[in-house]
Design a protein with these regions (language model features):
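Intrinsically disordered, low-complexity Pro/Gly/Ser/Thr-rich segments with frequent PxxP/GP/PP motifs
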Residues: 251-279
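Local sequence-structure signature of Cys/Sec-based thiol-disulfide redox active-site neighborhoods
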Residues: 314-349
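Residue-level detector of functionally pivotal "anchor" positions at catalytic/ligand-binding pockets or at interdomain
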Residues: 41-65, 197-219, 311-320, 570, ...
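Short, well-structured beta-strand segments enriched in hydrophobic/aromatic residues
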Residues: 129-166, 284-291, 445-454
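C-terminal tail/sorting-segment detector
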Residues: 3, 20, 615-631
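Short, solvent-exposed loop/linker segments at the N-terminal edge
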Residues: 216-222, 424-428
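Beta-sheet-rich sandwich/jelly-roll-like modules and their strand-loop junctions
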Residues: 23-108, 149-206
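Short, conserved sequence motifs used for protein processing/export or organelle targeting and
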Residues: 349-582
């Protein structure tokens, strides 16, 4: 059975400034592809109006929370900057039994209605229903929200479609006992297919607003191209622009010739890029652009936008963390097991897997003191604490889509470099950890999180068997999903409960409770600059469980050190290494009275003559490398 719900999707082409919200909304299968959705006959008052919206009119999907009898509010943002009125709506109909339907306009999502119209049926599925306001409403310069409210009779009653875009989808829902509150889901789902009908449009010769500026994260002295989006409401075609670029007070004028002319009309979208060389000093730089001319004519309005460029001392690899919510009692969790095992096998240098077993307390690997990270069901995962995903399907419905989700998140350049060494103490009652955190840009506020995980965990005991619902399905019913077919009928794991070998299982951490992390915190007040290194040490007590002790003695325990941004909650970078056994930390041996150490380096790779506090990297005469921590 293929998974048809998306928990959250976040595009990371540009750095995000707020933490992604968790959501109860789910998307059903896209069943209406290739259909041009019919528009009911317009009222006379809607003649000569122009539809505006973000969603597709040819490919609809449906969204809901999987329950009926729910009251939904759905809205889009209609930008200002255009002299026009809103005369009515094209209301997309999925649920023919919906009740208490109204359309409305508001200056804020929680504000009073500027205009409202009740709507009665009959409602025809897969059609736009046109609704006219009694009087046109003037579109204000600051824009407004256009939406509709209804009580559903189907589980997935909201029409969505097209490419995700800012302003495209705002949602609220309520039941008799609960209200979700408004949320911006524009970067998690396709936009609403709702349209407003604009009338009395008066275009200026030239009118433009910037919609985005994707300032990059990059190394010092590096060439860049920055994309800028805009919306034109101009009576003339646009061929070229003149802009002033201000980076941290340094202003440069640039002439931009558009790759394709922007046609005259309302809400015409375009994009251009401008290039340059990043500053020679690491830091955070405001990038502001202001529009000066269009087609050589001085621009009389005001159009500008700002982004933040992060300039790093150097580029280092990112290790991306996938934290999975799972448990032996979860019948659909075999797909999470398949996805995590695939990532571990195929991305050993960049994947940090952490499986926290909290689904059922009867699970021998159950670990209480770990945050659920907003995940409400298993299997589920969070990638770098930025985006929720399915640990097999990722952000969509594709087999092993977790790979694409991981690669997308792994593209972002980290602001810190992390080097780690860890060892069991002599009696193996605790793991001693040393981490060197190099700041590639001056830190603002961050925390360190330490997590012990164990590999190769298995047992023939009944309590260790993994529940499996997929044994009821054929391979075709899971779209012949690699690895997943093994749990289906006639597969090697095609039984209701199966023996597995579990990896990346949490057995200890710096969390003293599910919400309290005991790891170190570093802020801007500590005085660290770009290029400086924070030396951290930490100790985690060993698990008292027999199976965890066995994993430790067999050398199957890893330590992951994560650096979390305290403002966003995102993981900035991480490093996962194997915990060395006590014998690995004895003094460097010598042969025939001669040491086999040939060189010693600090965490930054600089040669040092004597041991220094923190992580020391020792190169041996035989070419091997050892990591030693000095407290």
């Amino acid at each position: 059975m293929k998974r048809f719900s998306i928990i959250a999707i976040i595009l990371l082409v540009a750095s995000l400034s707020v933490k992604a919200q968790r959501t109860d909304f789910q998307k059903s299968e896209w069943q209406k592809s290739g259909t041009t959705h019919r528009v009911a006959k317009k009222a006379a008052s809607l003649d000569d109006t122009m539809p505006f919206g973000y969603g597709s009119t040819t490919n609809w999907g449906t969204l809901g929370i999987g329950s009926t009898g729910v009251t939904f509010d759905v809205a889009i943002f209609v930008p200002g900057g255009l002299q026009a009125t809103i005369n009515g709506f094209n209301l997309p109909v999925i649920d023919t039994g919906m009740k208490n339907v109204s359309v409305w306009l508001r200056s804020s999502l929680t504000g009073e209605n500027l205009a409202e119209k009740s709507v009665s049926g009959p409602f025809v599925a897969d059609e736009y229903m046109t609704v006219a306001f009694d009087e046109p409403v003037t579109l204000p310069a600051e824009g407004l929200y256009a939406g509709y409210t209804f009580t559903c009779s189907t589980a997935y009653p909201i029409a969505i479609g097209g490419e995700m875009t800012s302003g495209g989808l705002y949602l609220n829902y309520s039941t008799s006992t609960y209200s979700s509150g408004w949320g911006d889901y524009s970067d998690q789902f396709a936009p609403s297919t709702l349209q407003v009908l604009l009338g009395n449009i008066a275009l200026s010769d030239y009118q433009m607003e910037f919609s985005y500026l994707n300032a990059p994260t990059l190394a010092i002295n590096t060439a860049y191209e920055i994309p800028v989006g805009f919306v034109s409401n101009s009576a003339n075609d646009i061929n070229d622009l003149d802009i002033a670029v201000n980076i941290n007070g340094q202003i440069e004028n640039k002439h931009i010739t558009l790759a394709s002319p922007i046609k005259s009309g309302a809400f015409q979208k375009g994009e251009f890029t401008f290039d340059g060389i990043s500053p020679a000093q690491a830091g955070r730089y405001d990038v502001n652009i202001a529009l000066k001319k269009i087609n050589g004519v001085d621009y009389e309005g005001e159009a500008q936008t700002t982004g933040l460029m992060k300039n790093l001392t150097r580029i280092v690899p990112r290790q991306t963390v996938i934290e999975e919510f799972t448990g032996t009692g979860c019948g659909y969790c075999p797909r999470g097991w398949v996805g995590m095992e695939y990532m571990k096998a195929n991305y050993p240098e960049s994947f940090v897997g952490i499986a926290f077993h909290k689904y059922n307390s009867s699970d021998p690997m159950y670990y209480e003191n770990y945050p659920t990270l907003g995940l409400t069901g298993a299997p589920g995962c969070v990638i770098d604490r930025k985006a929720e995903a399915d640990p097999y399907y990722g952000f969509g419905n594709d087999n092993l889509g977790i790979v694409d989700a991981f690669n997308l998140m792994n593209q972002e350049l980290p602001e810190v470099d992390v080097k780690v060494a860890a060892q069991w103490n002599d009696d193996m009652t605790a793991v001693d950890i040393a981490a060197d955190i190099e700041f590639l840009i001056a830190p603002e506020s961050l925390s360190l999180i330490y997590v012990l995980t164990a590999d190769s965990l298995t047992s023939t005991a009944t309590s260790w068997k993994q529940s499996n619902y997929y044994y009821q399905f054929t391979a075709a019913q899971v779209d012949n999903g690699p690895g997943l077919v093994d749990f289906c009928k006639n597969g090697k794991y095609g039984k209701s409960s199966v023996k597995l070998t579990f990896n990346d299982v949490v057995i200890g951490s710096s969390y003293l409770s599910s919400i309290r992390n005991d790891g170190q915190t570093i802020t801007s007040e500590d005085g660290y600059e770009a290029g400086s290194i924070y030396h951290a040490t930490y100790s985690i007590p060993a698990s008292t469980k027999a199976w965890a002790k066995s994993a430790a003695k067999n050398g199957h325990v890893d330590i992951s050190v994560m650096v979390e941004d305290n403002f966003t909650g995102y993981i900035m970078n991480a490093r996962k290494v194997r915990v060395e056994l006590p014998a690995a930390v004895i003094p460097v041996p010598s042969h025939n009275g001669t040491t086999n150490q040939t060189a010693r380096y600090n965490a930054a790779g600089q040669a040092i003559a004597t041991p220094q506090r923190g992580l020391n990297i020792i190169r041996m005469a035989d070419g091997s490398v050892k990591k030693v921590m000095i407290k």
